[in-house]
């Protein structure tokens, strides 16, 4: 299991490679993780190498290679930290309740739940319309939601698998109209298509990034994209 800092650094390196084509500098990694010295970055990279997530090309500058990303719910820590990178809190939903994602003590504390609407399927591949139907609902632990209004959507497709978001997962969304770069959002395109993607602002344009190398980034004028909410957690049924 990766530590939170190891996981955060791995996602940061992977994102930087996707955006720029080369590795971030040690200073950039230090600043991104809010560490005081570069020695902490060296230790994190060594640990990621030992666990088979990262490879260093020692005779080249800024040459890190991401070999694999962790499978959420097994390698990744629960999402309670800060920063814009999404680390899913995956709750295994069984017939007897919620299991596996929290310790026994925290599950016991999460018996108090709130019912939120489940709005059909959202594409994690090509965008599709979301079904705005309040007839289906899902019970979610209150402590998982925090403040604000929430709703749920079922993920369809595989374009976000490298962020640990799988086909059939139930995405828990905090309703809001703004988000920071790097956050995973529900985006409404041209008032008719809805998709779950990572947000990147590029001047007057908005890029919607997949977390799967087989999918291209889609770029739109900002006025064509409206943010419908931000991903805060996942439910997964086995």
UniProtKB/Swiss-Prot annotation:
The record marks 124-125 as: Cleavage. Pfam families: LexA_DNA_bind, Peptidase_S24. One of its GO terms (biological process) is proteolysis. GO terms for molecular function: DNA binding; serine-type endopeptidase activity. It comes from the Bacteria. It catalyses: Hydrolysis of Ala-|-Gly bond in repressor LexA. Its EC number is 3.4.21.88. The active site is at residues 159, 197. Residues 26-46 bind DNA. The keyword Transmembrane does not apply. Keywords: Autocatalytic cleavage, DNA damage, DNA repair, DNA replication, DNA-binding, Hydrolase, Repressor, SOS response, Transcription, Transcription regulation. InterPro entries: LexA (IPR006200), LexA-like (IPR039418), LexA/Signal_pep-like_sf (IPR036286), LexA_DNA-bd_dom (IPR006199), LexA_repressor (IPR050077), Peptidase_S24_LexA (IPR006197), Peptidase_S24_S26A/B/C (IPR015927), WH-like_DNA-bd_sf (IPR036388). Represses a number of genes involved in the response to DNA damage (SOS response), including recA and lexA. In the presence of single-stranded DNA, RecA interacts with LexA causing an autocatalytic cleavage which disrupts the DNA-binding part of LexA, leading to derepression of the SOS regulon and eventually DNA repair. Homodimer. Belongs to the peptidase S24 family. This is LexA repressor. The lineage of its organism: Bacteria, Pseudomonadati, Pseudomonadota, Alphaproteobacteria, Acetobacterales.
